UniProtKB/Swiss-Prot annotation:
Lineage: Eukaryota, Fungi, Dikarya, Ascomycota, Pezizomycotina
Coiled-coil positions: none
GO biological process per UniProt: arabinan catabolic process; xylan catabolic process
Subcellular location: Secreted
Catalytic activity, reaction form: Hydrolysis of (1->4)-beta-D-xylans, to remove successive D-xylose residues from the non-reducing termini
The protein's name in its UniProt record: Probable exo-1,4-beta-xylosidase xlnD
Active-site residues, Swiss-Prot/TrEMBL: D310
Glycosylation site residues: N23, N87, N142, N326, N385, N404, N440, N477, N518, N559, N614, N652, N679, N701
Source organism of this protein record: Aspergillus terreus (strain NIH 2624 / FGSC A1156)
Keyword Glycoprotein set for record: yes
InterPro entries: BXL (IPR044993), Fn3-like (IPR026891), Glyco_hydro_3_C (IPR002772), Glyco_hydro_3_C_sf (IPR036881), Glyco_hydro_3_N (IPR001764), Glyco_hydro_3_N_sf (IPR036962), Glycoside_hydrolase_SF (IPR017853), Ig-like_fold (IPR013783)
Keywords: Carbohydrate metabolism, Glycoprotein, Glycosidase, Hydrolase, Polysaccharide degradation, Secreted, Signal, Xylan degradation
Principal cellular location given in the protein's record: secreted
Pathway(s) annotated for this protein in UniProt: Glycan degradation; xylan degradation
């Protein structure tokens, strides 16, 4: 992350004289993926609220609670001078002191906990709950859990904002899809599936954060990011700031934008962030096709929703993209294309010049600022203590309920990849050797984008608090090639009844601005695991980190008893992992990414955005991959056995006419394709001896429509809680018309006649077949890609 300047430096930088100065120092952003930003961009500031009782604004329309939010905001902005207007177009706005309008910081974060807050050094407001990274939370396959986390995050954020320590909007969630396994920021995402996983995560997180679906009073403004085609940091020297991603309209519609469609159309997100990269030659923040044609006209983005550029992305349209001739033109292009707020300083530095040159009008500038302040009106920013969430305090942050949810997410997301019966550990195991670079992890468990947590329970701390004897040895580092710690590790292992190795990857080799060049276990961790396995004792390996590594060697080593994937588990990570290992809880998570063999990472360039297989590309994601994975997308074992039987109300081999489906009444659904037309119902019985949750993924497949055909695609998931031995429950998946549509070469969503299958999990334990008849039908027409940046208004 960029360095954060002091508040004093920010205030000095925000003087109007400073904002009129241009940046003339250019960095080669084609190779530098994470340069420092200007101090006024990255600073945290003390939030304060306008005084609508006795302040200068008290008699103006913006303080009239009975007026429409847009009208209140427009009345406020109409009072700004041009200089004042320009000064409030960046993420760090100066406010308007003469009107009693405080400065405001748009840039706050809440990926998996409150972040970029004005933290107290100790005591109240010095920490917030740290949840697992989204990729682990998504592996739990629990919608309710995602929504709860969003709700808790916004409650804690509002408590911080009420005392001036946080803003009222947040740059989260990250809903890009984890397309290629080397991507450093995949840990921040819900996994590799765009259509169902990322879209569901987006919906639940956004509605949790914002306080519902477009509520009258917003709780917090969520920002769906990064729009669009952003999933490479610095792979092989390709900087995220200068990447020009070549994406077909088919892939753009099918894979890179459906989660943004759901965010805008269904969840009613109030902010979207355009990304650093270009797509098909046009930088995202200067892309009118993305920001107007798709987002507003096709996806139905809320009228007063605002688009924020990623931090520095407006400037990047000039350097390194060279799409604009200079920074002033880059700013003019971006505001007219639809980027309302610049997370950066380009707008503030260059709008006055662009206005003088006739490149933009006051109306162009006002549009984005009005949208921002309309949202602040809906957040209660101008409503004083009567605002719905102004009574939230520190007592709403320090709740054990939030801590319990964090622990639950870590438990539910943990995935059992391999087990020979060693797990859960038998009661006869009284001593354990804990070895490896994750064994004593604390902040390591938080991944990236994290703030101070109330506590961080490492695996070592959790074990030492148990009734087991613990023999700890570091063994080796994440990327170490020295064997200096091997002897101590082996000595500790010889003293113990069982061995736990905690390793994998972490933010030293994956993260923002940091991609991997391979997907092998780094350093000499596998060498140490192999030597430990030769001791012939029960050996449990914890594979940690967001991205997958090729664990073929562990899968096939019969002396490796069990393998768990634990992601970045957050503040309760050690306790959660120990609960799984000892059988206090049973694992039921499923992989939300494919674990590929190591050769996949070098088989084709990671910047190849094509999903479908071709002569050099074996296909990307579980939908299109033609090879054999180490562990499949959706893989996950249990401590018990389950039997799944079809109990569907729809008869197998049913037939549906396409025209009838689309012309049938659809009350409660804005679009006919969102109406369920059949239910897939499975009867699940715990046939084993251990109480366990049960998770399932439902996949569709067909040979209808044009080739190539996907292997399958996800149309549902669910989680049943705590099935006791012998107990049964049913899980029902409503199947919508859109669920079984495909995307044609033009990007249209099309329903094709033909035979279809719905299958439960990779094992296909329950299968339902049906046929669609009649003529194919376009469900959503993808617009023609063209750039039409309007002239200055």
């Amino acid at each position: 992350m960029p360095r954060v300047a002091s508040v004093a430096a920010v205030l000095a930088a925000l003087l109007p004289s400073a904002l009129g100065q241009a940046n003339t120092s250019y960095v080669d952003y084609n190779h530098e993926a994470n340069p420092d930003l200007f101090p006024q961009c990255v600073a945290t500031i003390e939030l304060s609220f306008p005084d609508c009782e006795n302040g200068p604004l008290s008699k103006t329309l913006v303080c009239d609670k009975s007026a429409r939010p847009h009208d209140r905001a427009a009345a406020l902005v109409s009072m700004f001078t041009l200089e004042e207007l320009v000064n409030n177009t960046g993420n760090t706005g100066t406010g308007v002191p003469r009107l009693g309008l405080p400065k405001y910081q748009v840039w706050s974060e809440s990926l998996h906990g409150v972040y970029r807050a004005n933290w107290a050094s100790e005591g109240d407001y010095s920490w917030a709950t740290s949840f697992p990274q989204p990729i682990l939370t998504m592996a739990a396959l629990n919608r309710t859990l995602i929504h709860q986390i969003g709700d808790i995050l916004s409650t804690q954020a509002r408590a911080f904002s009420n005392v001036g320590r946080y803003g009222l909007d947040t740059y989260a969630p990250n809903i890009n899809s984890f397309r290629h396994p080397v991507w450093g920021r995949g840990q921040e995402t819900p996994g590799e599936d765009a259509y169902y996983l990322a879209s569901t995560y987006a919906y639940e997180y956004i509605t949790g954060i914002q306080g519902g679906v477009d509520p009258e009073t917003l709780k917090l403004v969520a920002t769906a990011k990064h729009y669009a085609g952003y999933d490479i940091e610095n792979w092989d020297g390709h900087s995220r700031l200068g990447n020009d991603m070549q994406i077909t309209q088919q892939d753009l519609s099918e894979y890179y934008t459906p989660q943004f469609l759901v965010s805008a159309r269904d969840a009613k997100v109030h902010s979207v962030m355009c990304s650093y990269n270009a797509v098909n030659g046009v930088p995202s923040c200067s892309n009118s096709f993305f920001l107007q044609t798709l987002l507003r006209e096709t996806f139905g983005f809320v009228e007063d929703g605002y688009v924020s550029g990623d931090c520095g992305a407006v400037y990047n349209a000039f350097n390194p993209h060279e799409y604009a001739a200079n920074e002033s033109s880059a700013s003019a292009d971006s505001i007219r294309a639809g980027t309302d707020i610049d997370c950066g300083t380009s707008y503030q530095y260059h709008f006055t010049n662009a206005f003088d040159e006739g490149e933009i009008s006051r109306q162009d500038i006002e549009r984005g600022v009005i949208r921002l302040y309309t949202n602040l009106v809906r957040l209660g920013y101008f409503d004083g203590n009567s605002s719905q969430y102004r009574d939230l305090t520190w007592s709403d942050v320090q709740t054990t309920d939030a801590w319990n949810i964090s622990h639950e997410a870590a438990v539910e997301g943990t995935v059992l990849l391999k087990n020979d019966g060693t797990l859960p550990l038998a009661d006869s195991i009284r001593s354990v050797a804990l070895i490896g670079p994750w064994a004593n992890a604390t902040t390591q468990m938080q991944g990236n984008y994290y703030g101070p947590a109330p506590y961080l329970t490492s695996p070592l701390a959790a074990l030492e608090a148990s009734d087991l004897d613990v023999h700890y040895a570091f063994g080796t580092n994440i990327s170490s090639t020295t064997t200096a710690g091997f002897a101590d590790a082996l000595a500790a292992a010889r003293k113990a009844d069982a061995i736990i190795f905690a390793g994998g990857i972490d933010n030293t080799i994956e993260g923002e601005a940091l991609d991997r060049m391979n997907i092998t276990w780094p350093g000499n961790q596998l060498d140490l695991i192999n030597q430990l396995s030769a001791l012939g004792k029960p050996l449990v390996v914890l594979q940690m980190g967001g991205g997958q590594v090729d664990s073929s060697a562990l899968k096939h080593n019969t002396n490796v008893s069990a393998l768990l994937w634990g992601g970045y588990p957050g503040q309760s990570g050690g306790t959660a992992l120990l609960d799984i290992i000892r059988g206090v809880r049973a694992p039921a998570g499923r992989l939300v990414t494919t674990q590929y063999p190591a050769g996949y990472a070098t088989q084709f360039p990671a910047i190849d955005m094509g999903l479908r297989p071709n002569g050099t590309n074996p296909g990307q994601t579980y939908m299109w991959y033609t090879g054999t994975p180490v562990y499949e997308f959706g893989h996950g074992l249990f401590y018990t056995t389950f039997e799944a039987k079809r109990a569907s109300t729809a008869t197998n081999h049913s037939s549906f006419n396409i025209e009838d489906l689309l012309t049938a009444p659809h009350p409660g659904y804005a679009y006919p394709q969102l109406r369920p037309f059949l239910n897939f119902t499975a009867h699940i019985t715990n046939t084993g001896r251990t109480t366990s949750d049960y998770t399932a993924m439902l996949f569709a497949n067909t040979t209808a429509g044009p080739a190539p055909h996907p292997n399958k695609w996800l149309v549902g998931f669910d989680r049943l809680g705590a099935l006791e031995p012998g107990a049964s429950q049913t899980m029902t998946f409503p199947i919508t018309i859109d669920n079984v549509a495909r995307t044609d070469e033009l990007g249209n969503r099309v329903l094709y006649p033909g035979r279809y299958e719905l299958a439960l999990n990779n094992e296909r334990s329950v299968v339902l077949r049906f046929t669609l008849t009649g003529e194919k039908a376009v469900l959503m027409k993808w617009p023609l890609e063209k750039q039409e940046i309007p002239p200055a208004a």
